[in-house]
Regions:
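Beta-propeller blade signature
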Residues: 169-181, 302-318, 356-361
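Beta-strand-rich domains and repeat architectures in extracellular enzymes and scaffolds
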Residues: 39-70, 285-293
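C-terminal motif of bacterial Sec signal peptides marking the signal peptidase cleavage site
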Residues: 16-18
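Short, conserved, GDST-rich strand-edge loop motifs in beta-rich repeat architectures
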Residues: 157-171, 288-305, 352-357
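Loop/turn-rich, solvent-exposed surfaces of beta-rich toroidal or solenoidal domains
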Residues: 270-312
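A short helix->beta-strand "capping" segment at the edge of beta-propeller domains
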Residues: 24-47, 318
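Surface-exposed loop and turn segments in beta-propeller and other repeat-based domains
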Residues: 39-41, 82-95, 132-139, 183-209, ...
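Repeated scaffold domains used in trafficking and secretory/extracellular systems
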Residues: 46-53, 93-101, 139-150, 213-215, ...
Length: 361
C-alpha cells in the first residue's frame, strides 16, 4: 500500500527565554517557517516522470509514458539537453529504469533495470549521453531504488521472498561491491514490518502488501542516512571502502525489532498516519518534507493539498530551518545544494511546470 505523507504532529509553539522579544520556536526547536515564493519554468518534452534526481549540472528524469526513457535538463534554468534510449528490450534500449541515488559531481548517474538484472552507469561521451558501464546482478536480490557510493558500493533494500499470507516479511538493508557483477558484502535486518496477504478469487491470484516503518535512504560522501518514518528514527551509518555499514548514531526513541514486530499492521488507519519523508542529504544537512492533505471523506480521492513544508536538520538531527513552499500542490521536491535551490512539480499533472525556489540556511 502506498501511504500518503501527511504532516508532522507537533506540539504547540514554545517561547524562547523568559525575557526579551526572541523569536518563537516550536517544540522541536525550529524557528518560524520561512515562506518561499517560486519562479515557474514551462516544460514540454516529458510526460509524468516516474523518477528524477539532481546529478551535477543536470536534472535527470525517467519516464515510461514516452518513446524515450531518459531526459536531461541543464540547471538551474531547466534548459532541455536531450532525450535518450528508446523504450524496448534491445541491447541499446531500456525496458524501464529506476534511478539510483548518488552525489556524483560529474553528472554521471546509475539506472537499475530489475527485469534484466542490470545496473548501468550513464554519462557524457563524445558529446552525447551514453552508457559508460554495465554491472550484472547475479545475486538473488533485485535492485530497485538504491544509493551508489563512489561508483563502487551499492546499498539497497530487499524483502524476503515468501508465498502465502505472512504476518511479518523480513526487510534487509544490503550493501554490494560493484565490479563486473554485484557481490554481497553486508546485510542488516531493517526495523520494518511487512504484512503480506494472498488469496485466489475467480481464478485470479491477488496479493496485498502493507509495510510499517519502511526505510528511506539518502547518501552523501561516505555517510548513509536511513529514515524510519513511522517511529521517527534517523540512523546514520559510515560506509567503509569495503562496503561494511557501520552504525554511527540512532536518533529518536528506542528502536528494537521486538517493538516493531509487536505492531498490528492490519489495525493501522493509513489515511490518518502522519509521516514526513527524507528527500535529500547534503554535506551538512538532511531535508525532510511534510505534505498536509485535507481529510479524506472516503468518496473523493482528490484531496486538497493544504501545506507543503520542508524541515532541515544537521546530521546530528539538530533543527536548522523550516520552509513553507507557496506552491503547495508541487509535492515532488528535489534539492540542489550546489546552487541552493529546490525544484518542485505537481505529480498529479503532466510535467508542465517546474517551480524553482531559492533558500538560505
Amino acid at each position: 500500500m502506498e501511504k500518503r505523507l501527511i504532516p508532522f504532529c507537533m506540539a504547540a509553539l514554545l517561547a524562547l527565554g523568559a525575557c526579551g522579544g526572541g523569536a518563537k520556536k516550536d517544540a522541536e526547536g525550529f524557528p518560524p517557517a520561512k515562506t518561499l515564493a517560486a519562479d515557474s519554468i514551462a516544460i514540454e518534452e516529458v510526460l509524468q516522470p516516474s523518477w528524477g534526481g539532481i546529478y551535477g549540472d543536470y536534472a535527470v528524469l525517467v519516464s515510461r509514458m514516452t518513446s524515450k526513457v531518459v531526459f536531461r535538463y541543464r540547471l538551474p534554468d531547466w534548459t532541455f539537453v536531450d532525450s535518450s534510449f528508446s523504450k524496448g528490450g534491445g541491447p541499446d534500449d531500456l525496458l524501464y529504469g529506476f534511478l539510483q541515488g548518488t552525489n556524483n559531481a560529474d553528472g554521471t548517474f546509475w539506472v537499475s533495470e530489475p527485469a534484466r538484472q542490470l545496473l548501468m552507469q550513464f554519462g557524457d561521451k563524445d558529446g552525447r549521453l551514453q552508457k559508460l558501464r554495465t554491472v550484472r546482478n547475479g545475486t538473488s536480490r533485485s535492485v530497485y531504488l538504491g544509493q551508489v557510493f563512489d561508483n563502487r558500493i551499492l546499498i539497497s533494500e530487499h524483502k524476503a521472498e515468501v508465498e502465502g499470507t505472512i504476518d511479518n516479511v523480513d526487510t534487509y538493508q544490503s550493501s554490494f561491491a560493484m565490479g563486473d557483477s554485484l557481490s554481497l558484502v553486508d546485510s542488516l535486518l531493517c526495523y520494518t514490518k511487512t504484512s503480506q496477504r494472498m488469496w485466489r478469487e475467480d481464478n485470479m491470484n491477488y496479493v496485498t502488501i502493507v509495510s510499517y516503518n519502511p526505510p528511506q535512504y539518502k547518501a552523501w560522501g561516505d555517510r548513509l542516512a536511513v529514515w524510519y518514518p513511522d517511529t521517527r528514527n534517523m540512523l546514520v551509518y559510515r560506509v567503509g571502502e569495503d562496503g561494511k555499514m557501520n552504525l554511527e548514531h540512532t536518533y529518536g526513541d528506542t528502536l528494537s525489532l521486538d517493538r516493531i514486530r509487536s505492531v498490528d499492521v492490519s489495525s493501522i488507519d493509513w489515511d490518518n498516519v502522519s509521516n514526513p519523508e527524507l528527500i535529500a542529504a547534503t554535506d551538512d544537512y538532511l531535508f525532510l518534507q511534510t505534505t498536509v492533505y485535507s481529510p479524506s471523506d472516503g468518496e473523493d480521492d482528490s484531496e486538497q493539498v493544504l501545506g507543503n513544508e520542508i524541515r532541515v536538520y544537521d546530521w546530528q538531527m539538530n533543527p536548522v530551518s523550516k520552509f513553507e513552499l507557496d506552491k503547495k500542490e508541487a509535492t515532488t521536491v528535489w534539492v540542489d545544494p550546489q546552487r541552493r535551490k529546490m525544484y518542485a512539480y505537481n505529480p498529479r499533472l503532466d510535467f508542465e511546470q517546474v517551480y524553482v525556489y531559492e533558500y538560505e540556511l
